[in-house]
């Protein structure tokens, strides 16, 4: 939907076709970082805090090792995915985007497809159909480097948020992300390397969360999804372009999936405004670069409990380092500059005996 909005803002005639019907819900952590909100504003969608729950920063926890930091500027918002989809749908309708729901798409030829059983011609085809993209397969764009693969599960609980942060907790079975999404509701998402683990098992492996959520009513059915770090060799071919998870992704630990999709949508519209897909192909990788680099670093902590605990103890003792890392994460500082200014110090502290 973001791609349709971005293209329509530049005057394109756009048809969105989907086999589902709104409201469309997809499993995710439901936290929009400040940079995500800025990209949404460029699409004409302004997120009122009353639509969800405001959060001021990020907290990491592993047992009694905890560190937190606030965003350098602005705040994030936790919002239920159907609410976000409804806002995007309203914006697309306002702009005059045409829509076909309950309309499966069957690719037929380079400039036409069957949409709900009827032939539909097009000049450009945008595949925004997720990790298992059929458009990607049809266009011969499946070649990719898969760097990580984990399993995610999400549910909502009727309980007032106890924190103004998005909290990431590590346990023996995986990670749990707690995002406030309303005055009396939180989103709880778990990610594990094990396919046989479910949300409750991961929560129960973290005493703090097990105690917090004891007796809390579950307000949504548990849903699952894969989370991948994947880079495609190409994201365009001929008159076909891929956006969102169809075009590659970073592990959900980054919380940047939606922001990347919004940036890609805006870049695609700019590229087609110049008459083709060259700009999109050439710059798409730069949108994925930082989230994938951050995912690599954070997944290293996920793999090695001893390193994770040391890192959290160091960051708790030097909170300015965590603030600087968060600034990099939300695009307000550069990773090379952070490494140049703080890399040696952080490495030395990791080796210091007091953090063993």
Regions from the language model: what does each represent?
Residues 5-28:
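Glycine-rich FAD pyrophosphate-binding loop
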Residues 16-17, 127, 243, 249:
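Generic enzyme active-site microenvironment
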Residues 25-59:
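N-terminal FAD cofactor-binding segment of flavoenzymes
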Residues 38, 52-138, 144-150, 350:
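Conserved N-terminal helical subregion
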Residues 128-209:
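Conserved FAD-binding catalytic core of PHBH/FMO-like flavoproteins
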Residues 194-270, 277-278:
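FAD/FMN-dependent oxidoreductases across multiple families
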Residues 270-356:
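C-terminal helical "tail/cap" subdomain of flavin- and related membrane-associated enzymes
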